[in-house]
Amino acid sequence: MNASDLWNKSLDILSRREHSVIELKNKLIRFNPDPNDLKDVIERLITSNFLDDKRFASAFIRSKAESGYGPNYISQYLSKKGISSDKYDMYSLEIDWEEKCLAQFNKKRRNKEINFKEKEKILRFLAYRGFSYEIIKNALKEFD
């Protein structure tokens, strides 16, 4: 696959969803392992504004927050995808993390009374979903 085909393939991949630079490199390397072609295409995508780690991070954060994940989970996943924390600000996107946490809590408890053991189980679930202790504590003040 030459550089032109690699360019077209990368546009095809990016037309489906946002990707990080590292994520796209890993996908494209299967089609053309030549590092020079790959580097040229990636640089061209970045300068053409087709590929942007900040835009990817913002879209990813919004998507995962809407799916009920907390900031700790999201930042850990982004670092796995090669996005450094200086590329995004989790708290500048006007996401109410306490509201998201409370929504997940209510979804788990199904609007019924719960005992201490069930509450602890839900709190562990919320921590697993990436909500910090502080967010959980603030979101669930009314249930103490």
Task: List the predicted regions and their residue ranges.
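An alpha-helical, amphipathic repeat domain used for nucleic-acid recognition
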Residues: 1-144
